[in-house]
Amino acid sequence: MNEKFSGKVWVLGDDIDTDIIIPTEYLALKTVEDMKPYAFSPLRPELAGQIKPGDIIVAGKNFGCGSSREQAPEVIKALGIKCVIAKSYARIFFRNSINNGLLLIENADLHDEVTEGDTIDVEVNAKITHNGKAYPIASLPDNLVDILNAGGLVKAMRKLNGLD
């Protein structure tokens, strides 16, 4: 996965839990599309309506903490977010995101140096560039790259088993 892209940054803080990403009361809605307007609503009610396809979330530490719910990465992906860059992730959220085809990147420094609305350039498995400064990215293991390239775990397994 050596993809390159640029995107507008939305900055979020530390400990953004799954109840903030998609509150419990909206989990009963029929589709992820129905849930999209309520994403991040406890923190920033207007945010879901402002995000455009290709935008990037830059967050602090422990992004995706709280209860395990597959709808959290699904709704982020449905909003059109290209990737989330955070200082760290809750482990279950990390795997749920990969399994749903949402790219997550860890970087300890970018959050403290980026401003909401900035544009950053991402070279997956290489670096992030912001205002001329490069931030290295650790490579993801090959098995996770394969899942992301397929669009998620179910699609990767279908491909592996010759069903697609």
Curated annotation (Swiss-Prot):
Q: What is the protein name stated in its UniProt record?
A: 3-isopropylmalate dehydratase small subunit
Specify whether Amino-acid biosynthesis is a keyword of the entry: yes
Q: Which Pfam families match?
A: Aconitase_C
Record's family?
Belongs to the LeuD family. LeuD type 2 subfamily.
Q: Which UniProt keywords apply?
A: Amino-acid biosynthesis, Branched-chain amino acid biosynthesis, Leucine biosynthesis, Lyase
Q: What does this protein do?
A: Catalyzes the isomerization between 2-isopropylmalate and 3-isopropylmalate, via the formation of 2-isopropylmaleate.
A GO BP term here is: L-leucine biosynthetic process
Keyword Electron transport found = no
Q: How does it assemble?
A: Heterodimer of LeuC and LeuD.
